[in-house]
Amino acid sequence: MEHRSYMRGGPGPSIVPVALLLLLLSPHSLGAGTSQLAEERDVEILRKLPHNSSSFTQGLEVQGKSIFESSGLYGHSRLSEIDSQNGEIIRQVSIDDSYFGEGITVKDQSIIMLTWREGLALEFDISNFSIIGNFSFEGEGWGLCYNGEHMVTSNGTSELSFRDPNSFETDFTLLVTWDGNPVSNLNELECVDDRIYANVWMEDTILEISSNSGIVKSYASPISISSTQGKGPEEVLNGIAFDQDSGGFWITGKNWTEMYLVNFTISEVKLSPDESSVFPALVAASGVTIASAILLFRVILKKKEPETPNFKDSHR
């Protein structure tokens, strides 16, 4: 005997309209598929320090109460230690005129400094700034940070190289994308946990990048700061260092007169005039979609109900 459920022929509601309703109300149907888009961050200034305007800043790093800075240009490249309380230079050392200093990072008791086109990374003793070693690498050197496992370097392209900290050999590269598009001109870097913060050369932009996927998670545009600094075309925003004591970031630029301790805060939603006119239309369209789904749901349910006999045609 074939057993059939008596429920199959009953007038109960079908799962089809319910599924349809849920589909229409899902985030994807309402245009919420933008979760991969980078979020904007506001820049909150916490403190200011005077900055040596002769410094063509290439890298910043905070260690304790000191800020270490590398300055570039052939014949003018140097490494400096700055007091984070008053901005005074504690000490500095110039490097060979044939080297163009670039990004720096701290590893144990050493400071590593990239050079631009010389294919060398110089290792300094952090206690006395003497050069105690170097590493060779191919291509240009721009930004550098250390995440505890890899030395991460940029070369002005959209790729970051993750290097063995002992040999400086490249273990792998990571393509950086912003809303699905590669980001070129990646410059100064700062590693913080599983994130990499990057300046973009010639732009007033700081990116927060996932070191796992290369996707830009958020961005900040400190235009209110950079608009008061740097009058020449080369005097751009560059230099970012995480300050563990305050939880903020020190930022500055090439030949700027000040350094700024900032926080990146969640940005308030600001709609442009065009977006303001589109948003109500999207809401209205969503309302129509929901209303249509409910109406369809009711129609299907009604068709499932037993029909009342047409007594005009009934034999009873």
Regions found by a protein language model. Give the residues of each.
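Beta-strand-rich domains and repeat architectures in extracellular enzymes and scaffolds
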Residues: 46-78, 93-105, 253-255
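Surface-exposed loop and turn segments in beta-propeller and other repeat-based domains
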Residues: 47-50, 90, 94-97, 173-182, ...
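Short loop/turn segments that connect beta-strands within beta-propeller blades
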Residues: 82-87, 125-129, 165-168, 210-214, ...
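Blade-level signature of beta-propeller repeat domains, shared across WD40, Kelch, NHL, RCC1
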Residues: 239-273
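Secretory targeting signatures
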Residues: 1-36, 189, 269-316
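Conserved beta-strand positions in repeat-built beta-propeller and related beta-rich domains
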Residues: 68-74, 106, 111-118, 153-157, ...
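A short helix->beta-strand "capping" segment at the edge of beta-propeller domains
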Residues: 35-54, 86-88
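Beta-rich, blade/repeat-based domains predominating
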Residues: 53-64, 97-108, 137-148, 154, ...
